[in-house]
Structure formats: C-alpha cells, structure tokens
Amino acid sequence: MVESYETQNRIMCEVKSFNCPAYGKFCNDSHRLATLQLEAEVQNWRACFTAYVSAQKAYIEALDGWLSKFIAPEVELYSRGRSSVPRPIFSGPPLLVICRNWLAFLEKLPEKAVTYTMKSFEKDIRALWVQQGEEQHQKRKVDGLASELDRKVLAFQRAESRILESKLHEHESQANVRSRIEYLTEKKAMLDMFRKRLDMEKEKHHNSLQVTQHVTVNRFPTGFSSVFESLLGFSKASEKMYADLLAFGKNAKVLDEEASK
C-alpha cells in the first residue's frame, strides 16, 4: 500500500503539467454528473476507510476481552498498570501482550488526518459542483439574450426596410416618414443598449468559466495529493506498527519461556 500511495501521489503531482483536453470548454450536464459521482465515491472511500479502522479496533478489543477472562487477577492488574491506556509492556501471556500493544498502536495511527483531508476534498468537489451550476446558469442566460438579440435585430431590419420603401412613395407624408425615422432611431438605441447588456453577461460567463477552470486545474490535484499523502502517512505508520508488534511478540514469547523454566 505504501508503494501504491506513493505512485498515486506522484501521478497527481505530474498531472498538473499535463494539458487537459476539456480545458477551456463550457461545462455541461455530463460534467456536473461526473462531479456528483466523484463526490459520492470519495464519501464512500472515507466510509470504507473508517469502517476498516473501526473493524480492526473492534476485533482486537473483542479478542483482548476474551483473553482477559483467562488471565489471573494479579497478572491482569499488573498488565494494565495505573494507566487506563494500554502500554507496550512485556507481562502476561504473549498473545495478550500483543493485543494490548496492538490496541495502543491503533489509537496512535493518524486516521483522523486521513478523514480530515478526505472531508476537505469532498468540500472542494461540492464547491466545484456549485460553481459548475453557476457557470451553466450564466451560459443559459447568455444564450437566451443572444437569441433575443437576433430576434430584435431581425425586427429592426424589417422596420428599417419598410421605412426605406416608404420614402420611395410620393404619397407618404414627410411628417409620417420623419416619425418613423425617429422611431427607428429610438429602436436602434435600445438595440445598442441590449448589445451592451449581452456583452456584460458574456463577461460574467467568461469570469465564471475561469473560476471553474481554476478549481478544476488547481484545487483538484491539490485535494487528491493531500488525500494520498495522508494515506501514505497512515500506511507507513501501519507498517511500522506491525513491525513493532512482531518484535514485541517475539520478545514477549522469549520472556514467557524464560519465566516458565
């Protein structure tokens, strides 16, 4: 597991230098769905990790409780000492010593660091999902305004054509033509204002897109790296724990054999 997490962490560090094919593209429903699925997987990952650690503790506690029933009171008292926290001491049957040491070591494993980084990463994923929703909302707003602008431009062009045609008819009064031209000028001013509004919304969408890209490209690799680093630390601590347990077990067995002679 140590080698696996080291490899995964190294890959996440290298990912920062790669060009993502989706970079710069607009967010769509499939992207948001993938984000939700990733959040669910990380939540399940954390739940499985917590269950894994809890299962180990529950198993050793049950085994310790069962073995304690066969230990004489004086040995039991000496094994526990004055502290309620199990200590790696060599007294009592070897199996009981291993259980006590195992429980003590399990409590010292950095499991909280792992769950903390996973929860932090889940928050980053949720923040991305929300940001993707805001980007999509802004994109729909821009698309709607763009369609409306096209309709307004088409209506303006038709009105402009009718006014130009009316100028060619001699029976059309100058006052009526002037009124239509003023109407057209007013509509053109409104059209220009609408274009400015659309440009402002496009700028908002561009900014929203940049925020989405920043979260995806920067916070995601960092979040994954933090998770793998914490798991790497947990795995190394676990590796050392089992090595120490093996050493304690051998020493306890030797002492037990010497005491029985």
Question: Where does each model-flagged region fall?
Answer:
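Extended alpha-helical coiled-coil scaffold domains characteristic of the BAR superfamily
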Residues: 1-261
